[in-house]
A protein has these predicted regions:
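Alpha-helical structural motif
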Residues: 8, 69, 98-101
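Bacterial Sec-dependent N-terminal signal peptides
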Residues: 1-26
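Low-complexity, flexible helical/coil segments
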Residues: 65-73, 124-127
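Surface-exposed, polar helix/loop patches in the mature regions of secreted/periplasmic/lumenal proteins
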Residues: 82-145
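N-terminal secretory signal peptides
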Residues: 22-70
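Long, low-complexity, intrinsically disordered segments
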Residues: 146-154
């Protein structure tokens, strides 16, 4: 019984890396950022920017290295004197989706006058694309399609 279990575990160990491998594919996206510091009441919105040299994960659709886009905004804010900013990045393949999320954030922070809202134009801050290295850009193994043959018995 233990031999069967070992065989199954060995097979699972060989299959899991193949299942988790996903290539990065070139995908243009719309992207914007939001930054705030919980030490004051100022919030910052970037413009919605079109980036044509970005990459997404072929399985999940997530922006490649998406945390680094937030770090870009955070470093920009720190260079401009904002202490401990918390930054988020919103992205989508469709501008309409980004505009919807942008409007929801803007509604939350711009109404009622509780926050000082500042807007960063593209000339103030622009995201820089992050390009994966060659090993991450290789195409993911594609599953072969099995043709269904119609065997008609006469």
């Amino acid at each position: 019984m233990t031999m069967k279990l070992r065989v199954y575990l060995a097979m699972a160990a060989m299959l899991i890396p193949a299942l988790t491998f996903a290539a990065q594919k070139h995908t243009p996206v719309y992207i914007c950022g939001f930054a705030t510091s919980f030490n004051d009441s100022t919030v910052y919105f970037t413009d919605i920017q079109y980036m044509d040299s970005t990459y997404t994960d072929s399985k999940t659709g997530f922006l490649y290295s998406r945390e680094n886009y937030s770090y870009q905004l955070r470093e920009h804010m720190q260079r401009n004197g904002v202490a401990n900013p918390t930054c988020i990045t919103i992205f989508s393949k469709k501008r309409k989706d980004v505009e919807k999320k942008y409007a929801a954030l803007k509604k939350r922070y711009a109404t009622k006058g509780r926050y000082d809202v500042k807007y960063l134009t593209t000339s103030d801050f622009a995201f820089t694309p992050i390009i994966p290295d060659e090993s991450e850009m290789k195409d993911a193994p594609k599953a072969q399609k099995v043709k269904k043959s119609k065997n008609k018995k006469k």
